[in-house]
């Protein structure tokens, strides 16, 4: 199933007037918990409820990125359980992981901010350093 991720993200950003994945999850009734995990995060669909779990050892900025990624799974792949493993997920060619990454970076790096960087002629590497997001995610965002 193909998703128009830009349109979907825009819908939720406008509906809830935020790009904060924690607020959007709250508004959608998606429960999340931060605790000790062996991986960065995971999304689970159990007994018709959606849950996101985040690793407590991640810095807040990375928790927000992982939350946005898992929120992407919750919205785009509602009934599939997914685990976020940093070093592998960003390199996987899995359609679901790529879509969740696109959802996350589309949500966290809106057009107006990205366009400011482009107009100022920042390189992808510079945008990654400024925003704190992986360079591969910035590249993925620019392809959107």
Predicted features, each with a name:
Residues 1-144:
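Active-site hotspot residues in diverse enzymes, especially metal/ion-binding acidic/histidine motifs
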């Amino acid at each position: 199933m193909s998703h128009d991720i830009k349109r979907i993200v825009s819908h939720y950003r406008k509906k809830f007037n935020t790009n904060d994945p924690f607020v959007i999850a709250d508004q959608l009734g998606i429960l999340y918990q931060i605790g000790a995990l062996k991986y960065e995060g995971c999304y689970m669909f159990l007994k018709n409820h959606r849950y996101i779990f985040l690793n407590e050892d991640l810095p807040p900025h990375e928790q927000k990125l992982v939350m946005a990624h898992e929120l992407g799974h919750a919205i785009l792949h509602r009934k599939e359980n997914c685990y976020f493993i940093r070093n592998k997920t960003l390199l996987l060619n899995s359609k679901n992981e790529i879509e969740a990454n696109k959802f996350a970076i589309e949500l966290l790096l809106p057009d107006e901010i990205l366009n400011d960087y482009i107009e100022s002629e920042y390189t992808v590497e510079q945008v990654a350093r400024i925003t704190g997001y992986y360079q591969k995610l910035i590249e993925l965002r620019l392809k959107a």
